[in-house]
Amino acid sequence: MATINDNYLKLKAGYLFPEIARRVNTFAEAHPEAQIIKLGIGDVTEPLPKACIQAMTKAVAEMGDRSTFKGYGPEQGYAWLREKIAAQDFQGRGCDIDASEIFISDGSKCDSGNILDIIGNNNTIAVTDPVYPVYVDTNVMAGNTGAVNEKGEYEGLVYLPIRAENNFTAEIPTQKVDLIYLCFPNNPTGATATKEYLQTWVNYARANDAIILFDAAYEAFITDASLPHSIYEIEGAKECAIEFRSFSKNAGFTGTRCALTVVPKTLKGKAADGSDVELWKLWNRRQSTKFNGVSYIVQRGAEAVYSEEGKAQVKGLIQFYLENAKIICSQLQAAGLTVYGGVNAPYVWVQTPTGLSSWDFFDKLLQNCNVVGTPGSGFGAAGEGYFRISSFNSRENVNEAMKRITEKFKV
């Protein structure tokens, strides 16, 4: 009989969001009359920007004409999209990123896991706690951890607690680590990072020959001009960091699928023989072998994000969700709850009332208010006592959810 990858057996039972879905479905079956409002998983609700729809409609028509039909595209992505990204997202912010260092993909979630294909198995890996579960689970799958303990932590990972006391920004580890996961604006806490803070991480990474995996999926929600949108705004980052970005949350591409990963050609890792190897070459080889590229139609839609009309429409979407976050923060505070995030970020991080665990609070909101959020403990042990609420929903649903909470749930 063929053997399996035993590392999958080390995964904690049930990925966070399927477990939420299971509980919600059980409740809905028992209470079919309940009008459940979901503010849990970070999926968008508003339609795609018109500029993107028009571009994709045109691209569909091109696929119906032999003279403009497109077959397999370049695995790295079409140059016309990568060049716009390089010019507007990076060079326009003073980042020396070339279009050739950008790889178009079907999701930053995929890339943050797939990047482990080119990373060795003997690295010391640091993650924040709480943390986006994908960073941890993909390392478990890849065999980079030991077993899980009673706290839900995996042996072999270095956990960096982020709490209100440190503004939900991890402190530099006292030990040497080789791989560092950072996400700003942060999922799940909604925290942001200053240039000075990120500089300390870049300095650490360069001093310790470490690599930073920087998730910038929510950078479009930054409205404070003093905050960096990219790790490459930090001096020295091109020598130590890979950045992941997505069109999912800024342009609503969660169901359309388009993202990008930046791998600078100056970034190197160590081979077993001690030689330095360019990670760009490895990632290019990996993508060429395992990935056939994002569809032409979708890439034309992503390109439209950079048109004048597209930029204005994306800005409107961002402002819409940020206004939702503002409403959530103000209404939860009115209910007597302590909240963090929701500014320069689409997530609101709520401290649960005294005596209630994260899952207790989840059940209480579901049963009493028919509102769904995400238990903080699902993001790590340090997330216990917190709860994530997403601003990704219609204004009507956000207002109704907050009305229910303020009326039925008072601290």
UniProtKB/Swiss-Prot annotation:
Which EC numbers characterise this protein's activity in its record? 2.6.1.83
Q: Give the matching SUPFAM superfamilies.
A: PLP-dependent transferases
User: If you read the UniProt record, what top EC class would you report for this enzyme, in one word?
Assistant: transferase
N6-(pyridoxal phosphate)lysine modification, residue list = K249
Q: Does the keyword Transferase apply?
A: yes
Which Pfam families does this UniProt record tie to the protein? Aminotran_1_2 (PF00155)
Q: Give the record's keywords alphabetically.
A: Aminotransferase, Pyridoxal phosphate, Transferase
- Gene Ontology MF terms in the entry: L,L-diaminopimelate aminotransferase activity; pyridoxal phosphate binding
Query: What reactions does this protein catalyze?
Result: (2S,6S)-2,6-diaminopimelate + 2-oxoglutarate = (S)-2,3,4,5-tetrahydrodipicolinate + L-glutamate + H2O + H(+)
Query: One biological-process term from Gene Ontology?
Result: lysine biosynthetic process via diaminopimelate, diaminopimelate-aminotransferase pathway
The entry's family comment says: Belongs to the class-I pyridoxal-phosphate-dependent aminotransferase family. LL-diaminopimelate aminotransferase subfamily.
| UniProt function note | Involved in the synthesis of meso-diaminopimelate (m-DAP or DL-DAP), required for both lysine and peptidoglycan biosynthesis. Catalyzes the direct conversion of tetrahydrodipicolinate to LL-diaminopimelate.
| Stated name of the protein | LL-diaminopimelate aminotransferase
Gene encoding this polypeptide?
dapL
